[in-house]
Amino acid sequence: MSEFQKVVVIDAKGHLLGRLASVVAKQLLGGQKVVVVRCEELNISGHFFRNKLKYLAYLRKACRYNPSRGAFHFRAPSRIFQKAVRGMLPHKTARGQAALEHLQAVEGIPPPFDKQKRVVVPAALRVLRLKPGRKYCTVGRLSSEVGWKYSDIVSKLEERRKVKSAAFYQAKLAKQKKIASAKAASSVNGKLAEFGY
């Protein structure tokens, strides 16, 4: 992500939460608009039970006499990711708030972004950064265990999207094949070569 683009869409599947958050935070401070899709597929290193215990301990942090004052703990994977990024930004300054407004994180791949080119961040990919055999868990599973209710809906919508995109890809391949065969069959190129073009 060295060159500046209007909006960068990152597919979060298979990325480590903290490593991706640090890269995104750096880009946001540079003025780049970033959209992170499939936040439920983010990974956290360490086995699931340990991460769940850590999250439950985090949920116990609240105002003693009036819990509605805060601290507020989000259960949705997209909000967990946003909070991780916020911790890496100077969010109490105008510059940090402006950077945070350029971030959009969502579960699944909703319609505006399913037609856009998605990128990955090699510096944050689990397969490249985590030693083979190490335990890890997904943010989606952790979220659904601590109160996120929309895991089934997101997975159902994702299955539907994958079927549509597979059909689109097959149609695209068929079209490319037709164009290639038409180019091979045409004798126009030969005629043009005869006349020196």
From Swiss-Prot:
It comes from the Eukaryota. GO terms for cellular component: cytosol; cytosolic large ribosomal subunit; nucleolus; preribosome; ribosome. Gene3D superfamilies: 6.10.250.3250, Ribosomal protein L13. Transmembrane segments: none annotated. InterPro entries: Ribosomal_uL13 (IPR005822), Ribosomal_uL13_CS (IPR023563), Ribosomal_uL13_euk/arc (IPR005755), Ribosomal_uL13_sf (IPR036899). Signal peptide: none annotated. The modification Phosphoserine is found at S151. Pfam families: Ribosomal_L13 (PF00572). Keywords: Cytoplasm, Nucleus, Phosphoprotein, Ribonucleoprotein, Ribosomal protein. The keyword Ribonucleoprotein applies. PROSITE patterns: RIBOSOMAL_L13. It is found in: Cytoplasm; Nucleus, Nucleolus. GO terms for biological process: cytoplasmic translation; negative regulation of translation. Its main location: cytoplasm. GO terms for molecular function: mRNA binding; structural constituent of ribosome. Component of the ribosome, a large ribonucleoprotein complex responsible for the synthesis of proteins in the cell. The small ribosomal subunit (SSU) binds messenger RNAs (mRNAs) and translates the encoded message by selecting cognate aminoacyl-transfer RNA (tRNA) molecules. The large subunit (LSU) contains the ribosomal catalytic site termed the peptidyl transferase center (PTC), which catalyzes the formation of peptide bonds, thereby polymerizing the amino acids delivered by tRNAs into a polypeptide chain. Component of the large ribosomal subunit (LSU). Mature yeast ribosomes consist of a small (40S) and a large (60S) subunit. The 40S small subunit contains 1 molecule of ribosomal RNA (18S rRNA) and at least 33 different proteins. The large 60S subunit contains 3 rRNA molecules (25S, 5.8S and 5S rRNA) and at least 46 different proteins. PANTHER family: LARGE RIBOSOMAL SUBUNIT PROTEIN UL13, RIBOSOMAL PROTEIN L13. Belongs to the universal ribosomal protein uL13 family. There are 3 genes for uL13 in S.pombe. This is Large ribosomal subunit protein uL13A.
